[in-house]
UniProtKB/Swiss-Prot annotation:
ATP binds at residues 9-16, 35, 124. Belongs to the MnmA/TRMU family. It comes from the Bacteria. It holds the Pfam family tRNA_Me_trans_M. PANTHER family: MITOCHONDRIAL TRNA-SPECIFIC 2-THIOURIDYLASE 1, TRNA 5-METHYLAMINOMETHYL-2-THIOURIDYLATE -METHYLTRANSFERASE. Its main location: cytoplasm. Its EC number is 2.8.1.13. This is tRNA-specific 2-thiouridylase MnmA. It comes from Burkholderia multivorans (strain ATCC 17616 / 249). GO terms for biological process: tRNA wobble position uridine thiolation.
Amino acid sequence: MSKRRVVVGMSGGVDSSVTAWLLKEQGYDVVGLFMKNWEDDDDGEYCSTRQDWIDVVSVADLIGIDVEAVNFAAEYKDRVFAEFLREYSAGRTPNPDVLCNAEIKFKAFLDHAMSLGAETIATGHYARVRERDGRFELLKAFDHTKDQSYFLHRLNQAQLSKTMFPLGEIPKTKVREIAAQIGLPNAKKKDSTGICFIGERPFRDFLNRYLPTKPGPMKTPDGKLVGEHIGLAFYTFGQRKGIGLGGSKDGSGEPWFVAAKDIASNTLYVVQGHDHPWLLSRELVAGNVSWVAGEPPAEGFACGAKTRYRQADAACTFARAGGERFSLAFADAQWAVTPGQSAVLYDGEICLGGGIIEFAATGQPGHAPAPAAAPALAEAR
């Protein structure tokens, strides 16, 4: 009887390496696949693709599996990076890792794996898949400190049915122990951080390569001019560092935070104090939705939601907001809910799916002009 073939997405990191070893130990016919999703465009100071590939080959040799490299740079540029630039140009703060998972790692990669005769794919993500009553559920990892279901919430039934997450029930500390015990050459390699195609290079420098600077006024909620910004695309809601007002003695003396953007007038609004009302929201509208089960929760469903990675689930109530949109009403005010980021819903351990945040209502008089999503929020009330 032939072994079931599983293709493992291998990045050169510890997690995907241990994933491949675990599946080999369980008797699968394991093939490693290294994805190159970005063409290096500098001297290698920030990009680690070459070293990552060397690590993948070394691990594959040690555990005794075949490995190949595939270039998805063109697909990544068309499906992920182009959207990344569009969102930043519109003044929002996108999360390309969410789109990369849906469009590249679990679409382009999945299709390629199937062409290699795989029955399933596996990655080193910290999450779980459970089949129940003929449906597939996306669950949080047992190690909640490493849970990555937030980034995977756009996966659908077809994708989950062919996906394995072997690390979903293993603490990260145990993964490191396994790597050391079996002698993986990358056992002590640091976890990757930041956006995959930016690496460790300064984010503003990278963005400036693709988006022009367009300076404009920086104002307080009452209209007082306190400085000049270099371009709305280079700032995000709740940002504290890099505003250029650290030494300002105006106002309360508290730190300054980015609070709003007015695209029409090219104005950046800033406030003082972490808990300023302009930074707190009890309601949001999200669009571009995706539901793991293929359909949204029931109207008025009480659930938990994350508006950023590693945030504790916030109690809220779900409502439809017209078209392919939904609104969330939170029990407690949420800090710096950022347009462009994902609002992801949970029913306990189960990730239901989510959407892209379009608008977060602070309910404060004199707020900067609201975007087009504001009427949808009013409609949902």
